[in-house]
Amino acid sequence: MFNIHSVEIDWGGRPLKLETGKVARQADGAVVATYGETVVLATVVAAKAPREGVDFLPLTVDYQEKAYAAGRIPGGYFKREGRPTEKETLVSRLIDRPIRPLFADGWRNETQVIVTVLSHDMENDPDVLAMVAASAALTLSGVPFKGPIGAARVGFINDEYVLNPVLDEMAETQLELVVAGTADAVLMVESEAKELSEEIMLGAVMFGHRHFQPVIDAIIDLAEKAAKEPRELTVVDDSEIEKEMLGLVEQELRAAYAIPVKQDRYAAVGKVKEKAIAHFFPEGQEPKYDKLRIAGVFKELEAKIVRWNILDTGKRIDGRDSKTVRNILAQVGVLPRTHGSALFTRGETQAMVVTTLGTGEDEQYVDSLSGTYKETFLLHYNFPPYSVGETGRLGGTKRREIGHGKLAWRAIHPVLPPHHEFPYTIRVVSEITESNGSSSMASVCGASLALMDAGVPLKRPTAGIAMGLILEGERFAVLSDILGDEDHLGDMDFKVAGTEAGITSLQMDIKIAGITEEIMKVALGQAKDGRIHILGEMSKALDRARAELGEHAPRIETFKIPTDKIREVIGTGGKVIREIVEKTGAKVNIEDDGTVKVASSDGESIKAAIKWIKSIASDPEVGEIYEGTVVKVMEFGAFVNFFGAKDGLVHISQLAAGRVQKTSDVVKEGDKVKVKLLGFDDRGKTRLSMKVVDQTTGEDLEAKQKAEAKAEGEAPAQAAGE
């Protein structure tokens, strides 16, 4: 029934198995990949005919995690998986980025890659395995894919690189880096680091590249056994069209790409394109070519003109040389009622970034295969259509926005204070108000400034820069702070963020083979120079966190109570804590270990809530004076509520200094009184006194009264002696 083929290797001390021919046999390519006890299924299906009217690769990649993989049932009313989680979206992009450049030019068939997590062993993260499985499925499918690729995760623990660290080891690592590529080239890097040097980061990339070579060999072995016949792809030769078009519009196109202002440049390029279209489609004549084909040739010519200009003259589209960063203006405190805000402008890219501080109630609960956890740092990136001068539909968050937000999150996360030192939930929102390249890195710079403006004590300010590359044969140019056009028309998009001490995040997408270690080394060094320059410009606005939190931010006080007192503070059905919150106006959060966080923008509310909670959770001390309320009057004395929920008896003899005939002569129910704790009787009942406390000032009179009594006792004795 089944025609099963498989390969198995030892990889990083664990078995990796790739199998095909048993599951999903109607897909063009299907591979079940197993690493440890984590299992994923990758499938590839491509349409039989090209999609009409498109000049791009119609590829979609979907990664999905099933709750059953971890022996769990999904939450929610419907008890089934819903829309993609952030993790699923990010891993979908992680798979997409290294495989997309490897499809043959001209492939226009609708292609879908679906990777499903079937089993998760709580040790091996499925994301890298998903990349390997997708690569294997594509290699078997017969679609024109110039792979396979391999992938690996690299950690850095105790000054040593670690291949595919298990989940428990991730808490110790100074680096989490995922790298993917072919046998001879790195194509993609995604990472977060704790201020590591350029040398360590580059070493990690090359370490990962070396160690996923056995995976590539295993995929090739499997393909030799089970790959389908390659699909035919007819490549159209457009060289004659390009030659004719070059002679027609080269000079005008070069002039258009010398215009520094983006909107003016686009208008000029549009006119040149209209001229080219008119030439190839003269009125009244039967067209020889498809319009989409001519538009594609023009697009290729645009790329070549920009690349030639840079390599031949050293001048870029906006007139800069390869190392110059665009003009920067950083401002903080730009919004009056927010907790922290910044406006970061770099050339024609601008980000309005806002920080909001919240309490434990604002933490995000994240449901993942490895369990539910609370996230206290959120960074959201929004890219509205007006930022590029276009109209568009506003709807749900797009994959690109999620990916760019996570990149900025990774850049900032390593420099945040530990949560136990700064117990706030932090949300940063970056609104891209203008965009012409590296808006994600503008978000990093703006986020750093907005956080410091809010009073968040970052280890160091953080900045980011996007690098590009033009490579033609032996000639290359590394570009600092790339424009949008340089991103689209170049060979590499290389984003580096960090502090003056080191790198916190590195993301790399390479579109061609042949990027050597030496080129990456040059790019990292140039990126460091650019990052230090940007940090200097940012410091003109703010160079460290403000000493005080923003005026409108909540204040949080943290203290501990005994765990056996938590129930008393919360009360039956939450009655006591609700009363504390309602009457003081403060937010109260109590954790299982007895940590109490009290938050309010009003300092008096915090003091009142803390006093109330401590009065419940603490034990009263003998000899201390407390304020209380008379709750019951009896013949033999009065019961006073004096320490949270605690009551004690003021005996009639302790009500006042003189003889008291009736308790009600001195106090009545509801009276506010000051009492001193005398101690406890044999039955543990609390003994209080009012007569030894000045009811106006709260002064302890016991010592004074004893001294007076002693003096009165000595006077009669002296008189008797005389």
Swiss-Prot record:
Gene Ontology process terms (BP): mRNA catabolic process; RNA processing
Class of this enzyme: transferase
Alphabetical list of InterPro entries matching this protein: ExoRNase_PH_dom1 (IPR001247), ExoRNase_PH_dom2 (IPR015847), ExoRNase_PH_dom2_sf (IPR036345), KH_dom (IPR004087), KH_dom_type_1 (IPR004088), KH_dom_type_1_sf (IPR036612), NA-bd_OB-fold (IPR012340), PNPase (IPR012162)
Basic and acidic residues compositional bias, start-end: 701-713
Region entry Disordered, spans: 697-722
Keywords: Cytoplasm, Magnesium, Metal-binding, Nucleotidyltransferase, RNA-binding, Transferase
Gene Ontology molecular-function annotations: 3'-5'-RNA exonuclease activity; magnesium ion binding; polyribonucleotide nucleotidyltransferase activity; RNA binding
Catalytic reaction list: RNA(n+1) + phosphate = RNA(n) + a ribonucleoside 5'-diphosphate
Known EC number: 2.7.7.8
NCBIfam families named among the record's database cross-references: polynuc_phos, PRK11824.1
Family under the similarity heading: Belongs to the polyribonucleotide nucleotidyltransferase family.
Name by which UniProt lists this protein: Polyribonucleotide nucleotidyltransferase
Source organism of the structure: Rhodopseudomonas palustris (strain ATCC BAA-98 / CGA009)
Lineage, broadest ranks: Bacteria, Pseudomonadati, Pseudomonadota, Alphaproteobacteria, Hyphomicrobiales
Encoding gene (name): pnp
